[in-house]
């Protein structure tokens, strides 16, 4: 039967009459996949009516150039036999290039037809066995390959061999099996490629927009380089990439950009500035007298308004020295003494207070949650319409309760309702996460007020080393958080032995919301005519003792009527008994106008230093305060450079000196040093635990088939070694069986 089919098939070959039939056949060709034996396929299978225009012959198999057409006779088993054509130029030279990717240049010149009896059947059968898929594409990945007077500009034949379905790369045709040390990329069409092969084609977007094997469009390119992924998505799937990027950002870190617009935003979405909402109480007061007051009413003039805006700018920072100075050390020809300095910021009128963006972090894990709610209601009442408030609660986890919302009448009502509904229970260990979330709210806001701050409300007690040194402990501690230098105030409601009066608490909250001076710096010195001497060190007493500097100290931002204390250490010759004068020059930035204000030097009389032998107990207290404050501040400077031994020696020597002075264990200075020693030991233990030698852990590598294979091999080796170590003889247990 096969011989009959072969005779019937080849008897229908005749010579080609016209060379233009090549062009017609190529125009009718479609990028379809042919089977290996097209003339034995199912009748329903689509067939290619032509064959490639040139054939690269193997040097071991002779192939003459020929031009013929084979038309099969219809039969029940073969209703539509294909029509075969093969044209080559007259001078066909054998080549040894067996690369699977070949580029064929087709000439428009006609070739001389050869005899139809040439032995091309075996070559045709060989080509059918070697090639599985043939696809002809031009530069635009279209089927039509003729342009500019029917001249072929670019022709690419992409084909697969019969064995590259899943085990070879579709680009380099090398082995693409897992475990060979090369990352494998599997496309949506299930074709596999080497990842370096795919990445190397990132320069041309057309090369990777479709699969090099089957031509399927690639849409999921998450494993490709970012530049490649962006170029591919620009061509067809920009919306999909934006959705995926937004999902990834939401998974990593949420963005809080849903803040309410400011009351007088310079740029409004609608194109005009909104009208400020008035207070209901003010409307009632204004509507009390509805009579016409005439044309000459007492309205504030522009000059009066300007004066009101500049009242706080002209206020100086008040600096005073205490009336005592205690000698703390006596050396050869000089003596060291210390004196207290009090700094108070000017008061700020409520009308001139800058709008504030406030984020409150509420601790709902304590037992006295009603105290926290009462304090939060007082904070809400202290805000104005131009202020914005956001609330974050935390217990075992943190949660943002409200976005930044203006405190209008409706805003206050909604905030109070949320505070009334607060209830929680937990261990309160997520305070750091809550503060980070509060800082993220401030960082992601779309519109910004001039002043921002964070309040942390908790009913816990302060348990710190520096707090024990203060005679009157404060229930507010201040610091700065994150790279934005956000002022963060922790209000320790549990530190108050009794409930604070509402007016005292409200006054303190308003002072924390009123930024009086910004970036305050003081330049301290001694008048040259008042004897030789210098300022050696300045230590902060507000909060944790910190070394501020020697002559130029930076105090940062200060709020309305805020008071701070610093301890100034001076050194002067012992023989000089003249009156010494200190000069103070202040410099700060006005928070409203952002103008830099420099003030002239002010002279302060330094009190005469007194030894501790005097009967005044304040001198001994000042000396003890200097010893403990200096030890804590200097130990912290040593801890910053990881000198834990030096810091411990500093604290222990100061403690021994205070014990030598006759202080009892209940003294605040001794308790502060002991608490600082406990903190230092905890920090040292943590530092040693980090630097302690740990078992060698191999570097983690990305999860790939190669890494998984290596991990499996390591586990197998460990299992074999354990089995070998636990192996016993076959006669184990039968030594005393007496065979």
Swiss-Prot record:
InterPro entries in the record: CLCR (IPR051266), VWF_A (IPR002035), vWFA_dom_sf (IPR036465), Znf_RING (IPR001841), Znf_RING/FYVE/PHD (IPR013083)
Catalytic activity: S-ubiquitinyl-[E2 ubiquitin-conjugating enzyme]-L-cysteine + [acceptor protein]-L-lysine = [E2 ubiquitin-conjugating enzyme]-L-cysteine + N(6)-ubiquitinyl-[acceptor protein]-L-lysine
SMART domains in the record: RING, VWA
Biased composition range(s): Basic and acidic residues: 19-30, 235-248
Residues in RING-type zinc fingers: 169-214
PROSITE patterns noted in UniProt: ZF_RING_2 (PS50089)
Biased composition (Polar residues): 31-56, 86-98, 265-276
Region: Disordered, residue numbers: 19-56, 72-120, 232-291
GO biological process, one term: polar nucleus fusion
Entry GO terms, CC: plasmodesma
All residue ranges annotated as the VWFA domain in the record: 357-459
Description of the deletion phenotype: Embryo sac development arrest. Unfused polar nuclei.
Entry EC number(s): 2.3.2.27
GO molecular function annotations of the record: transferase activity; zinc ion binding
Bias kind Low complexity: ranges: 99-120
Record's compositionally biased regions (Acidic residues): 278-289
Entry-linked SUPFAM superfamilies: RING/U-box, vWA-like
UniProt entry keywords in alphabetical sequence: Metal-binding, Transferase, Ubl conjugation pathway, Zinc, Zinc-finger
Pfam families associated with the record: VWA_2, WAV3_C, zf-RING_11
Protein name: Probable E3 ubiquitin-protein ligase EDA40
Protein's gene: EDA40
């Amino acid at each position: 039967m096969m011989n009959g089919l072969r005779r019937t098939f080849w008897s229908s070959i005749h010579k080609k009459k016209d060379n233009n039939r090549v062009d017609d056949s190529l125009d009718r060709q479609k990028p379809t996949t042919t089977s290996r034996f097209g003339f034995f396929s199912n009748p329903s299978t689509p067939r290619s009516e032509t064959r490639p225009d040139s054939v690269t012959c193997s040097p071991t198999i002779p192939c003459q150039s020929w031009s013929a057409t084979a038309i099969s006779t219809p039969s029940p088993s073969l209703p539509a036999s294909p029509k075969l054509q093969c044209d080559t130029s007259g001078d066909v030279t054998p080549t040894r290039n067996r690369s699977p990717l070949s580029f064929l240049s087709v000439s428009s010149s006609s070739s001389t037809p050869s005899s139809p009896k040439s032995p091309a059947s075996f070559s045709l059968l060989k080509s059918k066995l070697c090639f599985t898929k043939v696809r002809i594409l031009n530069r635009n990945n279209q089927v039509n390959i003729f342009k500019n007077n029917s001249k072929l500009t670019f022709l690419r034949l992409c084909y697969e061999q019969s064995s590259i379905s899943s085990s070879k790369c579709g680009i380099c045709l090398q082995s693409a099996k897992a475990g060979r040390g090369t990352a494998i990329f599997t496309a949506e069409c299930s074709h596999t490629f080497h990842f370096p092969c795919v990445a190397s084609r990132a320069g041309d977007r057309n090369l990777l927009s479709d699969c090099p094997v089957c031509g399927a469009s690639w849409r999921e390119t998450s494993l490709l380089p970012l530049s490649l992924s962006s170029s591919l998505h620009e061509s067809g799937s920009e919306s999909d990439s934006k959705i995926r990027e937004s999902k990834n950002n939401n998974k990593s870190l949420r963005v809080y950009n849903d803040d309410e617009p400011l009351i007088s935003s310079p740029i409004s979405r609608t194109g005009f500035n909104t009208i400020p909402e008035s207070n209901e109480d003010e409307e009632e007061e204004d509507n009390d007298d509805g009579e016409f007051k005439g044309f000459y009413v007492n309205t504030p003039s522009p000059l009066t308004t300007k004066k009101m805006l500049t009242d706080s700018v002209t206020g100086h920072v008040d600096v005073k020295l205490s009336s005592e100075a205690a000698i703390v050390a006596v050396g050869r020809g000089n003596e060291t003494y210390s004196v207290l300095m009090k700094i108070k910021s000017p008061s700020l009128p409520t009308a001139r207070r800058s709008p504030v963006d406030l984020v409150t972090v509420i601790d709902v894990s304590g037992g006295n949650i009603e105290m926290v709610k009462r304090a939060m209601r007082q904070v809400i009442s202290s805000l104005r319409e131009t202020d914005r408030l956001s609330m974050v609660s935390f217990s075992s986890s943190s949660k943002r309760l409200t976005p930044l919302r203006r405190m209008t009448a409706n805003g206050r009502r909604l905030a109070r309702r949320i505070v009334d509904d607060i209830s929680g229970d937990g261990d309160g260990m997520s305070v750091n996460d809550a503060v980070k979330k509060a800082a993220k709210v401030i960082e992601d806001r779309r519109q910004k007020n001039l002043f921002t701050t964070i309040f942390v409300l908790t009913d816990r007690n302060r348990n710190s080393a520096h707090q024990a040194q203060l005679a009157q402990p404060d229930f507010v501690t201040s610091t700065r958080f994150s790279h934005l230098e956000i002022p963060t105030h922790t209000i320790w409601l549990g530190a108050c032995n009794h409930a604070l009066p509402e007016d005292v608490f409200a006054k303190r909250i308003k002072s924390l919301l009123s930024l009086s001076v910004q970036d305050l710096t003081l330049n301290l010195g001694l008048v040259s005519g008042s004897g030789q001497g210098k300022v050696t060190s300045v230590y902060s007493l507000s909060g944790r003792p910190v070394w501020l500097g020697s002559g130029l100290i930076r105090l940062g931002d200060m709020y309305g009527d805020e008071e701070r204390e610093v301890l100034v250490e001076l050194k002067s010759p012992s023989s000089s008994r003249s009156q010494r004068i200190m000069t103070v020059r202040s410099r700060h930035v006005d928070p409203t106008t952002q103008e830099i204000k420099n003030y002239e030097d002010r002279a302060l009389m330094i009190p005469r230093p007194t030894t501790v032998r005097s009967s005044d107990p304040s001198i001994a207290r000042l000396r003890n305060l200097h010893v403990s404050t200096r030890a804590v501040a200097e130990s912290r400077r040593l801890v910053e450079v990881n000198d834990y031994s030096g810091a411990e020696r500093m604290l222990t020597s100061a403690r021994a000196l205070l014990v030598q002075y006759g202080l009892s264990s209940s003294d605040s200075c001794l308790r502060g040093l002991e608490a600082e020693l406990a903190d230092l030991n905890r920090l040292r233990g943590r530092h040693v635990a980090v630097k302690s030698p740990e078992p060698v852990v191999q570097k983690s590598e990305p999860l790939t088939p190669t890494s998984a294979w290596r991990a499996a091999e390591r586990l197998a080796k460990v299992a074999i070694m354990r089995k070998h170590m636990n192996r016993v003889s076959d006669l184990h247990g039968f030594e005393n069986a007496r065979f």
